[in-house]
Amino acid sequence: MDSSTITRKNILDDVTSLLTSFGFKTSNIYDRNCFDLLARKKDILIILKILVNIDSLTPTQAEELSKISGTFLASPIIIGYKSKHNYLEEDIVYERHEIPVISPQTLCNIIVNDIHPEIFAKRGGYYVKINGNLLKNLREKNNLSLKELADISHVSRETIYKYEKGNSQTYPETAMMLEQVLNSPITESINLLETNNTKTTTLDKKIQEPIELIKLGYDIKSSNKAPFDAISERQEETEEVRQLKEKLESKLDEIEKIRAEINKKTKHHNLLITNMERNRSDNTLNKIANCTEDISLITGHDALFVLEHKKDKEFIKKIPAIYTWELKNMDNMEELLKLIKERKEEANDS
């Protein structure tokens, strides 16, 4: 395709087609939001923003994208075609506002061929990350001292020492020279589909509505750049989470693995995609319901409407509607979750 004719819609259509062809469930497309598309395959959840020029991403969009991704335990990725100065190169990870950026072809290589990039771009050029433990093991296996390997590779002894201790960022040319000497790959790939490979935060703008959900123990965190009003996060720990935390304290060598499991269990059971009535018309509520049902399906989290005025309906489209007077009469979160489940079943049977 002629580069002058490439549009955001072209890229978005190609990305959606690619993901669905390889087993991902994809959401509707959400223009004018901090993300355009959600995609899930088994435990992988990615949130995508599509741009032709990656420098058009605003700090506000990036911050909101990062927070929503962190809240959903998803991986945020920006797919772009060029920057202000250059076209994006294949199999290189760029960055804008601390969110990874790749070209459509790089995404294709990841999804189709399971080839993850190793090179990332930063100020000063291109870099790779060396596996320090592997480097040390290979050096010792080849009976090389730090100085001997350094001399052969034309770097300092201190540089090799730093690589082995984990300060492993270096130029691709240096890594290639070490690999030639050791006759083995030593660089680490960047798996953008893993949430622990992206720096994210969670939604933190707490709001004080609906007060009835807050009294049941939920934190309500709003998003101004998403197709829903807020995420309601349950603060009460389940017994399963408490047991995992005990396990965490007793097995220090598995800290990261268990912490990730805690996060998964906590988030999976504790998030509600939340929409408020806010004097919206029935037509507007129906449009919001369509978006919310779609996002709920992809993320795997329940959704609800909190309504103040009696509308003689227990769901909007397929999304349970809970009234503020019902919330006031509840004693705990379990009652709410039970009612959501009942109304969800009624909606599906209707």
UniProtKB/Swiss-Prot annotation:
DNA-binding residues (ranges): 146-165
Protein keywords: DNA-binding, Transcription, Transcription regulation
Record-annotated HTH cro/C1-type domain positions: 135-189
Gene3D superfamilies registered for this protein in UniProt: lambda repressor-like DNA-binding domains (1.10.260.40)
CDD domains to which the protein is assigned, alphabetical: HTH_XRE
Pfam families per the UniProt record, alphabetical: HTH_3
GO molecular function ontology, one term from the record: DNA-binding transcription factor activity
Protein name listed in UniProt: Putative HTH-type transcriptional regulatory protein Msp_1143
Organism: Methanosphaera stadtmanae (strain ATCC 43021 / DSM 3091 / JCM 11832 / MCB-3)
Taxonomic lineage from the root: Archaea, Methanobacteriati, Methanobacteriota, Methanomada group, Methanobacteria
